[in-house]
Design a protein with these regions (language model features):
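Serine-dependent acyl-ester chemistry module
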Residues: 110-143, 168-171, 180-199, 223-225
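Catalytic His-Asp segment of secreted/periplasmic serine-dependent ester chemistry enzymes
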Residues: 180-275
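Conserved SGNH/GDSL esterase-like catalytic core that processes O-acyl groups on lipids
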Residues: 38-45, 49-147
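A short helix->loop->beta-strand "cap" motif at the edges of active sites that frequently abuts
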Residues: 157-173
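Short loop/turn segments at strand-loop or loop-helix junctions that form parts
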Residues: 100-106, 178-180, 220
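Generic structural signal for well-ordered alpha-helices
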Residues: 146-160, 201
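N-terminal secretory targeting modules
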Residues: 1-55, 62-68, 94, 271-275
Length: 275
């Protein structure tokens, strides 16, 4: 009798541990609880924040969602490079179900560099020039942030047939994030000014609306308080974590990525649900 009670206690404890680990015990079988995006491939694009420099982005997303995540960011590059034929060709030849774009970490968003397509926009009222679309048949040669973002979206969406062929007939979903706040060198630098962060945010939202692209407003949703974060300085330190949600005032740390991926997973589930 004593051995039977002991065995029961062990089984109960094992069952509790299994549930805590995301495992469901059913009569006669052991079944792991499915994660929300199993079998899905997610392409993480943009700059160093989505590159192999910070593998915990990919690892966190895979652990939480059950997906396969591929880091495809170009370290140190601007939105203009992301719009280039070189980078877009690389992206458009990757099999994926979702592409998540976090672009603009190396664009400061200062006045006169962002642009707008709408003469009635907030950006135009702030003095940003009204610009034209770029020519998709040529390599990217725009001069403003908004032209680069728009070029990326139109180029990607225009290659749906190629992407479907890579993806077994399914059209991948493009999710474009508004850029995160950052601070570099000093509070007075262009990188550190909230009005410049907001200018980039407005440009990305304008392009998403213009092109029918799903927008994830990480800038607003995450609500990171930069007053609590360190100031980024060169050279990049990829080892020491000096902040709350940022390693260095530019690159999110594991806690920041935990917040970011929560919103990304939620957005992918929304886009993946039956319409």
């Amino acid at each position: 009798m004593k051995n039977r009670k002991t065995r029961r206690r062990i089984l109960v404890a094992a069952a509790a541990a299994a549930v805590a680990a995301g495992v469901i015990l059913l009569p006669g079988q052991l079944m792991r609880k499915p994660l929300p995006l199993e079998g899905v491939t997610v392409l993480l694009t943009g700059d160093s924040r989505s590159s192999d420099d910070y593998t915990f982005y990919r690892e966190t997303l895979e652990k939480k969602a059950g997906c396969r995540a591929v880091t495809a960011g170009a370290s140190g590059k601007t939105a203009a490079y992301n719009a280039s034929d070189e980078y877009m060709s690389f992206i458009l030849n990757q099999q994926h179900d979702f592409s998540i774009w976090l672009v603009g970490g190396n664009d400061d968003g200062s006045p006169g560099t962002v642009g707008t397509f709408d003469a009635g926009s907030v950006l135009a009222a702030q003095g940003e020039a009204v610009v034209n679309e770029t020519d998709l048949s040529a390599d990217y040669n725009g001069t403003t942030f908004i032209q680069a973002i728009d070029h990326i979206m139109r180029k990607y969406l225009g290659e749906n047939e190629r992407l479907r062929n890579l993806n077994g007939g399914k059209t991948p979903v493009m999710i474009f994030c508004t850029d995160l706040p950052q601070q570099r060198n000093s509070a007075d630098s262009a990188w550190s000014r909230p009005e410049n962060w907001e200018r980039k945010r407005l440009a990305i939202q304008e392009c998403c609306e213009k092109n029918g692209v799903s927008c994830l407003d990480l800038y607003s949703l995450c609500g990171f308080n930069m007053a609590d974060e360190p100031m980024f300085t060169e050279p990049t330190d990829m080892i020491h974590d000096r902040g709350i949600y940022y390693m260095d005032g530019l690159h999110p740390n594991s806690r920041g990525i935990d917040v970011i991926t929560d919103y990304e997973i939620q957005k992918m589930l929304e886009e993946n649900s039956p319409k």
